[in-house]
Amino acid sequence: MEKTYYPGPKKRLGQHFLYDKRVIRKIIARADLVDGENVLEIGPGRGHMTSVLADLDVNLIAVEIDTDLVRGPLSEVSAVRKFEIINKDVLELDLSTIFGSGEDYKLISNLPYNVGGRILRKFLSGTRPPSLSIVMLQREVAENIINASGKLGIMGAFLGAFVESSILFTVKPSSFRPPPKVMSSVLRLSRLDRPLISPDKAGKYFQFIISGFSSPRKQIRNSLAHGLKLAPSEVDKMLTDSNIDSVRRPETISVLEWIRLFDLVSTRKDSSLI
């Protein structure tokens, strides 16, 4: 088959293509795939991981925003392997249209660095989250999600209401083309049996977390007062009612503590604050 033309990675899309076959095999192995499962790959790029997934007995859908990739390298892969390609921005994808209605699926992705967090928010906190996600992110972002070194970031405080997370392994820049300037980590995100926040409240919960981290170097009382535009005395009462020390920093607040605070704020008459 004649090779199709592809102009190369696009910086604006955060493209760093994973070439390392050893890493690709490790990622897929950690997904614990069984015959007949539904698999969604986001950002298949040049199709290196797609090729391996498509050789398995799974129902594979690959979503790629880059039309040049879809018409070029991915068309070559699909010519000899069976899977579905959706040429679309995954952030605009209607999840009710993929696989069968109500069917479970697993998410596998080398996430684009520039929108990885937004993609995880959309999929993991929505009404149709994957049962398991094995994804690549910048190591620093991944560590903030899993509460490494006792520090929980915005994404960790948010996603912890929907999934259990752990870092599986790190990946060197040399495994990508072009190589990123930072180390990457592969995350395992397993869906909770019941989310701690209902999907219809996920957006407000995320905004509340952002408010709580508005001044991350300050004490939680000052950060929340600033983010929610409340008097420190009001925040002190909420913290006391939630059994949280007001001098702690936002990064030390656990997921369950964030949820307790959110529930308190949500019951206020002026809950439009969030």
Regions found by a protein language model. Give the residues of each.
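An accessory alpha-helical subdomain
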Residues: 185, 189-191, 197-237, 242-245, ...
